[in-house]
C-alpha cells in the first residue's frame, strides 16, 4: 500500500446484504468495515468513523468489537422498528413511517447505495464512471495483509 497515498476497497452484494469498505492513507489503515446480513455478521470494524460516514448517517461504531458493533446495529434497527410501529399506530402508513424514520438518526444497516455514496465522497462514485472520460490505464489489485483480519 505504500506505493499509493490513498488506497480504497469497496464491496457489496445485495443478495446476502454484504457491504465492505476499507481506506488506507500513506500506508496506514484508517477505516475497515465489513458486514454480511443475518446473525452476528459484522465481520470487521477497525478505526474511527470517518467524517464521510457520519455525513451519510452511518451508525458510529468507533471502538466497538465486531460483536459489539453488530449488537449496536441491531439495537438501532429495533429502535427504528419501534418508532415505525408508533407512527403507524398514529395513522401513518407503514411506507410513510419507514420513510420518516430513514430521514432521521443513524442508519441501522448500510446498503449497496451507501457503499457507492461513500466511494464518491472518498474518491469516485463507480456509478458515475460510464459518464466520465478516463484514459485507458493500468488497474491495480492487491491482497490485504493478513494482520488486518480481526
What are these regions (language model features)?
Residues 26, 31-150:
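Long, compositionally biased intrinsically disordered terminal regions
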Residues 1-32, 36:
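Single conserved position on a long alpha-helix in the C-terminal lobe of the eukaryotic protein kinase
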Amino acid at each position: 500500500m505504500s506505493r499509493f497515498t490513498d488506497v480504497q476497497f469497496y464491496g457489496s452484494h445485495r443478495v446476502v446484504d454484504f457491504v465492505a469498505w476499507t481506506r488506507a492513507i500513506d500506508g496506514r489503515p484508517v477505516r475497515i468495515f465489513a458486514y454480511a446480513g443475518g446473525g452476528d455478521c459484522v465481520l470487521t470494524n477497525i478505526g474511527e468513523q470517518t467524517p464521510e460516514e457520519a455525513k451519510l448517517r452511518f451508525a458510529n461504531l468507533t471502538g466497538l468489537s465486531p460483536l459489539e458493533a453488530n449488537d449496536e446495529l441491531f439495537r438501532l434497527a429495533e429502535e427504528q422498528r419501534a418508532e415505525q410501529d408508533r407512527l403507524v399506530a398514529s395513522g401513518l402508513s407503514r411506507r410513510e413511517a419507514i420513510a420518516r424514520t430513514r430521514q432521521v438518526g443513524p442508519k441501522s444497516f448500510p446498503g449497496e447505495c451507501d457503499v457507492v455514496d461513500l466511494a464518491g465522497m472518498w474518491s469516485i462514485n463507480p456509478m458515475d464512471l460510464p459518464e466520465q472520460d478516463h484514459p485507458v490505464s493500468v488497474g491495480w489489485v492487491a491482497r490485504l495483509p493478513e494482520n488486518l483480519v480481526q
